[in-house]
């Protein structure tokens, strides 16, 4: 149902305010929540029934309409259901709305059940509902310069697609919640994963400041260091060559220098010079370590030093990474655009990059970590008396273990 008048909006708001479960979705002009505008909102409170509320491009009018639904979004008594809810929460944040109450994210629910599979709505609809959804490409066309924006379409063209999103998500929720096999799985979902969603949304919304001048200095530092390495590599090889070319690297290392007897080749007959292979032969000649170091610097330069300034949001002056909750099978978070969890921490090159991240004015960065958390969990689960005693007494667990093994006093362990 298309809700395109103020009177219809008032009616649907009253219905939503009395609903215990609300499936919701936002339609926007892009996939980056911090850079897009809302085109509309869809809601479903029972299967096979949904509503779509268009949101105009004029900012003041858009804020007015979205604000009318504030009591719905901020009603702590209703369960909010969505697919990839972090995105919708972020979009609504940019309109001054905080989503309150318990959450049920179908993407995260399926991740808990089948972490190694895909979790997109189209895939889940096919698997669980035997239903093929309307694909976004059918509305705006395939990716490319000619692709339309959702803003280019009339509400009449969008509302069936948008209503389907909210309806399918509600249907998936009704199936997936029954898939939680035991209380431990339920607790993991409701007590850990779901409360984490708005936390990650706030982290992404806050973003982090970047010191452009520090990056410029780092760029000069990395470029200078790479040139020095190049000269060292050329001197060892006895000739200049393109270090970025796997073909030329292979020819220099294995044809000219013959640093190993057994070489590996690809199906096309080219020498293998992948990072894994070069690491495995690093001790055969100093030039290999130099080439690996050069590659590492080039990667850091391209991934962070040169890329970070381009990822600064012009509206906030910060970079806003995306924290991915449903990627790793182990439950660990990952991040992308940019990947802020993969910056080297122990070497000088990593420190050079990290100094470009700065706190807000009047604030400080605070770094905290659990002390030996894995071993503490092992002690708790195993109820091992020796481990528990070591932790309770404040001793170093490794020193206590060594003392036990060698039957000496812990004070003698060095």
Predicted regions and their residues:
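Generic long, charged, amphipathic alpha-helical segments
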Residues: 393-414
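Phosphate- and divalent-cation-binding pockets in alpha/beta enzyme and binding domains
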Residues: 87-94, 252, 377
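Acidic, metal-coordinating catalytic cores used for nucleic-acid/nucleotide bond scission
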Residues: 79-89, 113
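Active-site metal-coordination segments of metallo-dependent hydrolases
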Residues: 160-161, 388-395
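Feature representing long, continuous alpha-helical segments
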Residues: 67, 123, 351, 375-376, ...
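Conserved "right-hand" nucleotidyltransferase catalytic core of DNA-directed polymerases
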Residues: 1-57, 74, 83-85, 100, ...
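Conserved beta-strand -> loop -> alpha-helix junction used to position metal-binding or nucleic-acid-contacting
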Residues: 98-114, 394-398
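Short, basic/hydrophobic alpha-helical segments
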Residues: 62-77
